[in-house]
Amino acid sequence: MTDLVDIRGLTRSFGGPAILDGIDLTIAAGEFVALLGRSGSGKSTLLRVLAGLDDAPARQLRLPQRRSVVFQEPRLMPWKTVVDNVTLGVKRRDARSIATQALEDVGLSHRQNAWPLTLSGGEAQRAALARALVREPELLLLDEPFAALDALTRLRMHGLVFDLWQKHRPAVLLVTHDVGEAITLADRILVLDGGRFTKEIRVSLDHPRRRSDPEATRIEAELLTELGVEPLHA
């Protein structure tokens, strides 16, 4: 696979110790990468750099042109219908038809003319995913998009995101605090701590993945230990 993202020596600070301390990162086309780390470890800062929302010096910073971000909050415009939110900023003549297809992909075609304030949390996040997909991103950036959802909705969203990734095949970077979520979805898991990557694990388990799988259990224990959490089954 070709490296879609290639970053060398990326550094970011805000007047104190470096949040990102000369890190190197590659993400291949179509690869699903999960990024774990404690609060304040720089995960969201890195995602913002990848999204072009923050500048940071680097020896090399190669990013694809087509990038989309889904944040923890859906950030829908309440005065626009769902479909108008999805097409916001899209200049193509066929924007409406592409948005309709994207809403169908996320299971929300029946709510395309609804107002955002009438959506459930899961529906609003589906709309945010459709808005990201309509731009046909080469790189999809997910900044803890399931954190505010209840447990059952989170599980459903995991399945949806995996299916969308399989269909559209963007490279994905998922920022999360949830080790199980990372193991369920990602090809590769990175741990960020002290401004550097301290752990990299490739996950070769077949999908659908089960947390009870011995290899998943081993990876979970290794990641929790790296994050300073004692595994419950240890």
Where are these regions (language model features)?
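Catalytic Walker B motif of ABC-type/P-loop ATPase nucleotide-binding domains
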Residues: 140-143
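Helix-to-loop junction immediately C-terminal to a conserved catalytic motif
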Residues: 51
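A short, proline-enriched helix->beta-strand linker immediately N-terminal to the Walker B motif
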Residues: 134-138
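Conserved structural motif at the start of ABC-family nucleotide-binding domains
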Residues: 5, 20-22
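Conserved ABC ATPase signature
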Residues: 115-119, 123
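The feature captures the beta-strand-to-loop junction immediately N-terminal to the Walker
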Residues: 36-38
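Hydrophobic anchor residue at the start of the ABC signature
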Residues: 129
